[in-house]
Design a protein with these regions (language model features):
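Short helix-initiation/N-cap motifs at beta->coil->alpha
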Residues: 29-35, 108-123
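Glycine-centered hinge/linker elements that transmit conformational signals in sensory
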Residues: 35-40, 80-110
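Extracytoplasmic/periplasmic solute-binding protein
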Residues: 1-3, 8, 18, 32-82, ...
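Short, solvent-exposed loop/beta-turn-alpha elements that line the ligand-binding surface or hinge
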Residues: 27, 69-92, 141-144, 156-165, ...
Length: 277
């Protein structure tokens, strides 16, 4: 039974956004516009980092970018067939993500140990982070900040297969073991937690998306994501399919950390992934 649904995308500190001289008109829907926003933040007098990230979530950066070029199904095919060197968009996506770090758009501490990266948004050091809808609550509690949060989907790329209608969504869930002697009672208990007044109490307590579709009021910190959830027509799995093969997800993650730490070039990244099978 689905519980605590989530949506992923770029969450940003609205106060820092304004401090860097940005307005709602600057919210990017394309990769070029995102780079323009990052450049504007870097060149401002704010001293802010445009973006930040944590080590365990670098796969979201590359997964989203690759899926924008190819679509999620072809991302999975690429991994399954290990055709990294044969798909030019694989290197192009690597170039894109690497430039965020090489050009200084990412925080100097990124990729940081979790949750030090995402906490920079609450500490007034970085403006944006690609994360799930749990991040505003986590950061607010960790940093004791009272900032407002904004949201936009990971942007589209030129000549890409998917646009901002592709969004990584999911949920936690309750299950009943097959050996349970009280299956119906367990189901009824889980249902009582995920619906009605109890669902809203949990939503209010941790600023999460309601599980019950009859509970239409989202927490204020997540409100900017509501229209994008309604426009979503292509649901992505975790990291947009980048972890579809459990035998190789650790190798992919290892190479992504080297790429984002600027320890290898995009060419080396693709070469190493091509040799993983």
């Amino acid at each position: 039974m689905p519980y605590q649904p989530y949506i992923t995308g770029v969450w940003y500190n609205k106060d820092l956004w304004e401090e860097a001289g940005l307005t709602e008109q600057d919210i990017p829907d394309t990769w070029e516009k995102l780079i323009r926003v990052c450049r504007k933040i870097k060149n401002s007098d704010s001293g802010l980092s445009a973006m930040t990230c944590d080590e365990e979530y670098v796969n979201l950066l590359y997964g989203y970018q690759l899926a924008r070029y190819l679509g999620q199904e072809k991302v999975q095919q690429l991994i399954r067939n290990c055709t990294w060197s044969q798909i030019p968009q694989a290197k192009e996506a690597a170039d894109d993500i690497r430039i965020l770090f090489f050009a200084g758009y990412m925080s100097q501490s990124a990729p940081a140990q979790h949750p030090e990266g995402q906490d920079e948004v609450g500490d007034g050091e970085a403006v944006m982070v690609l994360q799930g809808s749990w991040v505003p609550n986590e950061v607010t509690e960790a940093t004791e900040s009272v900032d407002s949060w904004g949201f936009f989907p990971w942007p589209a790329v030129k000549a890409g297969t998917d646009g901002t209608e592709g969004v990584m969504v999911g949920a936690q869930g309750f299950g009943v073991t097959k050996d349970s002697q009280m299956k119906q009672e367990a189901f009824d208990f889980a249902y009582s937690i995920c619906t009605g007044e109890t669902d809203m109490k949990m939503t209010d307590a941790v600023n999460s998306i309601p599980a019950d579709t009859d509970n239409t009021q989202w927490p204020e910190v997540l409100a900017d994501a509501v229209p994008y959830m309604k426009e979503m027509s292509k649901p992505y799995m975790w990291a947009a399919g980048l972890e579809a093969d459990p035998d190789y997800k650790e190798q992919i993650q290892s190479e992504l950390l080297k790429l984002t730490r600027l320890e290898e070039t995009s060419d080396e990244f693709i070469e190493n992934l091509s040799n993983m099978k």
